[in-house]
Every structure is written in structure tokens, then in C-alpha cells.
Amino acid sequence: MAATAASTMSAAAAVTRRINAALRVDATSGDVAAGADGQNGRRSPVAKRVNDGGGGKDDVWVAVDEKDVCGARGGDGAARPPLFRTYKVKGSILHPYRFLILLRLIAIVAFFAWRVRHKNRDGVWLWTMSMVGDVWFGFSWVLNQLPKLSPIKRVPDLAALADRHSGDLPGVDVFVTTVDPVDEPILYTVNTILSILAADYPVDRYACYLSDDGGTLVHYEAMVEVAKFAELWVPFCRKHCVEPRSPENYFAMKTQAYKGGVPGELMSDHRRVRREYEEFKVRIDSLSSTIRQRSDVYNAKHAGENATWMADGTHWPGTWFEPADNHQRGKHAGIVQVLLNHPSCKPRLGLAASAENPVDFSGVDVRLPMLVYISREKRPGYNHQKKAGAMNVMLRVSALLSNAPFVINFDGDHYVNNSQAFRAPMCFMLDGRGRGGENTAFVQFPQRFDDVDPTDRYANHNRVFFDGTMLSLNGLQGPSYLGTGTMFRRVALYGVEPPRWGAAASQIKAMDIANKFGSSTSFVGTMLDGANQERSITPLAVLDESVAGDLAALTACAYEDGTSWGRDVGWVYNIATEDVVTGFRMHRQGWRSVYASVEPAAFRGTAPINLTERLYQILRWSGGSLEMFFSHSNALLAGRRLHPLQRVAYLNMSTYPIVTVFIFFYNLFPVMWLISEQYYIQRPFGEYLLYLVAVIAMIHVIGMFEVKWAGITLLDWCRNEQFYMIGSTGVYPTAVLYMALKLVTGKGIYFRLTSKQTTASSGDKFADLYTVRWVPLLIPTIVIIVVNVAAVGVAVGKAAAWGPLTEPGWLAVLGMVFNVWILVLLYPFALGVMGQWGKRPAVLFVAMAMAVAAVAAMYVAFGAPYQAELSGGAASLGKAAASLTGPSG
């Protein structure tokens, strides 16, 4: 018996060595050499440079001098390397970048002074409005630019982590949230769970929790199917070291770089697993009809019932297809089901190939992580707080079932793209050599997206933010929490302050536990263990009725009544951007955060490519930002533990929609050019335009430096500029209006869930890009486009009627530059509202040219004679007045 166990352990160790050899890690850069990225193996420029070592060949980033000391020594007394490397922008780029920022600040002040000295007496109201707008533009630019002065990149060293924590990695609880199997297609969710179960992390040291906020039997039975298919998929991933470990994305790749140890078996195993996956997808797609058919059979046997039935012949305790009392959305019991029990600590090798088991797993550890399905109780009269409420329930339930000291959260449409993604944040959390590891509340990864249209029409990749702004915050107190792809320290979620302000255990003991965390003694009893970052997962020995009662209490609606949940504990409530505010609360307490750079990307997800859905998405974000400003989470109210420039960054995040009100009206100013010749924002108008061109050009030059150090492309930057203008002409002003109504009426703002539809039925994965969903939110931007097209037509008409060298003519041409610039920025929106015609951009150009020509012809025919008549009349009145008053002086 002992010999058998020894041989089993030896075989498992050999497999582990083989996998670790295949998944080799570059010790300098932390690059995981494991297959191609989800985007056909393409690397982003910034990742490629850093993973080349950040050394001599890198023309942007340079490694910060870090000595391998600080008391971190191995058993032989040798200094151990740090668990992550820090890079800063080279001075040859950073210093000119900072100088340009200072120069533009001086130019803005000079521009304001010039405008005050040349006050427009003809239209004081117009001049005043534009002056207020320009001052706010300058202020918002300063808020946006100051936090970007010291960008920092941090790259985990997975080889160093393996050397120092090869067998004692701490436990991790992984949270996944979903609501609606229609708006969030269930195929995304099952692939997310499968990628998590197959992650390269000690299988007995992490657990996966799915929160189904809709309480649907479809989601539950999909997880049952996942648990079955994972018995094949996870060992296959371990045997062949496949990347990525989401089956849908893995099988969609045309080529894969093989890193496993048995290449001769890959093709046969690949064919077998792919066939099983296709059958698995068929079962997932047919779940709804299967459950309905089963329920019809059971309901026929029980006259008068219209229930939804589980496979074991019992009523589903959640929502039913036909709503009934206690079985409908917003009113159903809580559910906690352990679908996969916690595995043993010893490896369990699979079976050799046979007729019943075509895939040989004899040398592969076939254990699976713990998998738990959760649907919290919902009752009328309670505000269930959407995603934040679901996350807090998972935080409590996981404390009883696994209580890992670290937590990672995912949206249901994000998957693990890099199998070592759970190891990477540990490099920052566990590096306590005076480098802030113990004071790190969370590690945020960039968000990367699949199936975005090739030109990224609506800036879904948002690289300016993810690779620019977030790296800038990395040089301060850390990035903001972005809602998904984030590892937390559990005690930070409990509202405990960082160790620099006191040990976690002593803080917890000093708290008013019942009033802060609720009445569950079982949950409270887990808190001290959860504060130990060295802790693994120690599951409950028996899930008996008493534990079931505790779990029911923790998922109940009333549990949080009279407690600090949603305010000082867990995810923050009563705000649309609960992610940003939750991260802000931790920063306000003095915690730090880290923005991690790994290659391939740690996680990938989906993004809405439909114009309407994308606009609703940023409406929710901008509305939540304003809610943050007008709440107790205002950055101005934070204490001294918040870094000064971090405060500026949060202030910018919570006020940026306000500036767009002025942008919106600026875009409408050309209307006055259509009405009269007398309205000018500023005189002398030509000099004013030259000032504007200079100030705007400087911000674009600064942007080119950011493009350089952020490693993004010019297309990324241009798309960001375009979509900012699209948001500024409709969405952001709408968010400001919503916030004003909330302040007046006291009623909250409802923001709809972003729909991420699949397009498999059409055969075109970009079909949503050319679908027009008409909503009122589109109207303001359409009006802006019409006004500026008309203004261009009038300008062309003036140049034709008066001559381009006359004062009216050349002023019209100068003004037309502004109108054309606005139209260029709104070009993606115009394509979007064209629907299927958007596939042919030439149609748009022809239509606009015809519209401009028509307006110009109308101006020449009707407007120019009228203006000439007005000018002639004004001249006659002037002569008459002169004859009456006589010569002056």
C-alpha cells in the first residue's frame, strides 16, 4: 500500500515537473511562455518591450534599480530576488512630456488673460458662456493631467514566486457573477467557469463560486453540466498545457504553440475533447427546452401545478418559467449548492486509455477545485443592490465554505486567458520586503476584449485608459478598481485598515462585530483566519443542517439590516459604479493597489459592439461617477491617508461628465452662424481661432508622448478622441441631467444592464455593429451632426458668394475648420446610425457632400442677397446719422 502511494506521488511529481518545464517563466520579465494570446498570438507593443527585459533594447521603459536584499534570504543565506520588477519611463521621454504639460498650462493662462482683455461687447452673454466653458476645460484638463506625471509599470516575476512559495501558495476564492442567461449568454458563463477550474494553481488551494442573481434553473443545470465536462477538460489542459483554457476560445484558435510533454497524443486527444465540447454546447443550448419539457411532464402528473422541476423530481426553489408566489424574480428563496467538493491535498492520477476512457490521463492529476452555486434570497421591499449585493453574499458564504485570504472576482463574460493569472497577483501580495506587499489591498489587471471589430469603431479596447491612465495611477497610490479581473485581500474587503495602522487581528477584535458584520457567529468566527495571508483553504468537514442554516441566514435579505455591509464592509451600495467607490474606500483608508502587466493577458472578455449598447454602458459609468461626486465618497472629503494626486485622480473620475455640457453647447454655436452675421464668440475672431488651434495642437502633441510611453497605436488614440466626442454630445450631458434630477427629486437613477448578445445565428460575429436600435439617447448627437454639416455648407456658400479673400469669406473658412473637426470626431457615430449602409463609408461621404452643396447653394441663392441687403441698409443708416450729427471732433 505504501509502495503504491509512493509511486503515485512520484508520478504526480513528475507530471508537475513536466508542466512547470512546459510553462517556463522568464525570470527577468515574468513572461509566461505558454501558447499564443487570444488575439492570434499578437502581443501589444508595451508588453513585448517589457517582456524583453526592460533593458537596453527598450526605448521607453527602464528598470528601477532594486537590490535583492531587504532581509529576504534563502536557506543558504543568499539574497532572494524581488517578486516583481518596477519600470519607469525613460527621462528622454518623461522630461519633455512634463515640460510640454507646463508649457500648455502657461499657454492656457495666457489665453484666458487675452480673452479677458478682449471682452466681446457685442454679445456679452455668449462671451461669458464660452469663457466659463474654457475655464472649466482648463480645470478639467489639469485634473486629468496631473496624475499622469510619473507612470510606473510593475511586472510579476513568476520564477521568483515559484522559488519562494513553490508549495505554500495561499488560498484563493474566485467569484463569478451573472444575472440573465439572455443578456449575458450562458455560453460565456460556462466558459468562464471552465477556464477557472483549469487554472494553473494548486487545485486544493482555490474554490470557485457562481452567483446567479436571477435564480434560474438554467444556470444551475448549466453548472451541473460544467462539473461533468470539467472532468475531461481540466485534465486535458494539464496534460497538454493548453492556452487559453476557455474551450470556446481555445478551439477557435487556428494555431497553438504546443508546450506539453506528449505531442504524439495531442491530435487524437484534441479531436476527442473537441467532439465532447460540441456535444456539451448542444446540451447547454437546449437546457431551456429540456427543463420546460421535463416540467410539462411533471406538471401533467400533478394536476393544477405549473412549477419548474429539477432533474431529481423536486421543485426548483428559485424562479420558475411561469412566475408563482415565492418563485419569481425578486421573490424567491436563497440557494447554496456545492457542485464539486473540495479536493484532497494529495494528487489523484487518472485512468489509462481504454474503450471507456479514450483519453489517457494516467499521468495527470485529475482533481477538480471546489465549485459552488449561489442564488441569494430576494423579497419585495428590499433593495437587493444588484452586483454589489451579490458579491457581498458570496463574500459571506465563501467565508464559511473555504475562507481563502484572497478573493478574485470576474464578470460572467470574462475568462482566464493566461493559466498562471492567479499566481501573478501573488507576486505583489506576498512581497513584504518593505515594498508594500502587506499594504496592498488589491491587484488590478487590464481589461482585454475579444470579438471587437477590427477598426474598434467605438473604442471598446480603450487602450488610452487601460495602458495610459492606469499606469499613471500605478505611480501614485495605485489604480482604481475596475469591476472585474481583480484580486482582493479579504480583510481589506472587511473594512480593516492596512497593517501600517495596526495589525488586522487586533483591529477585528476591537470592532463592534454584531453591528458591523451581522449576527452570524459562524461567519464572525472565520474573520481572524481570513486575515492570515499564509492560510490555505480548510473546508468544513461536514455540511450538516446547522451549516445549511448558517448559509441560509447569510444569504437572507434581512441579514444586512442594521449592519455596515455596503458602506464600510464589502462592496459599496447605492451607486452605479460600485467598483470605483469600493476601491476608493480602500485607498481612503491608506491601502495601496497595483496595476499588473502580464503577457499573455491574464483575462479577456467581451464588449458591446452595438452603438446603442455601448452608449448605455458609458451612460451608466458617467452617471455613477457623478453619483460618487455628490456622495460621502467625494474625494474632497477623504482624509490625509489619500495621496494628494490620487485625490486629484478620483476628483477627475467623478467630475469628467460636467465638462461635456460646455462641449455640447460649443458644438451648437454654429447655429448662430446660420441665423445672423453678428454673433462671434470672441473678437478679433481670427486671433481667437489661432489661439484655439495652438492650445488644441499642444494637447495633441502631449497625447503623442502618451501614445509613446503607453505603447498604444495612433488608431487607439484617435478612436479614444472620437468616442469621447460622441459621449460628450449626448451621453455625458444626459448623465448630468439625470444627476440634476436626482438631486432635485431625491430618486435614484436606473441604469440598464449592458446586453452582450451572441450572433451565431446570423453567421456574422460583427452583425451587432450594423444593427441600429433607435433610442432617444441618439438624438442629441444627430442634431449636432446636422448643425455642423449645415454650418460647413454656409461657410462654403459665404466663400463662394463673398470670395475667400474677403473678411466674411476667410472668417467663414476658418470657422469651417472647427465644424469639419467636429464631424471627423463624430464619424464613427454617423456610420453607426447608418446601419447596414455603414459597411460602405463612401455612401456617408457622398451624402455629406451633397448636403453641404445643397446648403451652400441655398445660401448663395437666398442668404447672400439678404445679407447684402442688410449690409447696404446698415451703410445707408450710417450715412444718414453722420449727416445729422456732422463731423466729429
Curated annotation (Swiss-Prot):
Any one Gene Ontology cellular component term annotated for this protein: Golgi membrane
GO BP of this protein: cell wall organization; cellulose biosynthetic process; plant-type primary cell wall biogenesis
Name used for this protein in its record: Mixed-linked glucan synthase 2
Topology within the bilayer: Multi-pass membrane protein
Name of one Pfam family that matches: Cellulose_synt
Signal sequence, renumbered to the chain: none
Subcellular location: Golgi apparatus membrane
Primary enzyme class: transferase
The organism's place on the tree of life at top rank: Eukaryota
Renumbered residue ranges of the record's region Disordered: 34-53
EC number: 2.4.1.-
Catalytic residue list: 213, 579
Binding site for substrate: 411, 413
UniProt keyword list: Cell wall biogenesis/degradation, Coiled coil, Glycosyltransferase, Golgi apparatus, Membrane, Transferase, Transmembrane, Transmembrane helix
The family this protein is said to belong to: Belongs to the glycosyltransferase 2 family. Plant cellulose synthase-like F subfamily.
Task performed by this protein: Catalyzes both beta-1,3 and beta-1,4 glycosidic linkage on beta-D-glucan. Essential for (1,3;1,4)-beta-D-glucans synthesis in grasses and cereals (Poaceae). The mixed-linked glucans (which are not present in walls of dicotyledons or most other monocotyledonous plants) are particularly important constituents of the walls of the starchy endosperm and aleurone cells of cereal grains such as oats, wheat, rice and barley. They can account for up to 70% by weight of the wall.
Organism placement in taxonomy: Eukaryota, Viridiplantae, Streptophyta, Embryophyta, Tracheophyta
TM ranges: 93-113, 123-143, 655-675, 685-705, 723-743, 777-797, 811-831, 842-862
Major localization class: Golgi
Any coiled-coil regions, as ranges: 265-293
Molecular function via GO: cellulose synthase (UDP-forming) activity
InterPro entries recorded: Cellulose_synth (IPR005150), Nucleotide-diphossugar_trans (IPR029044)
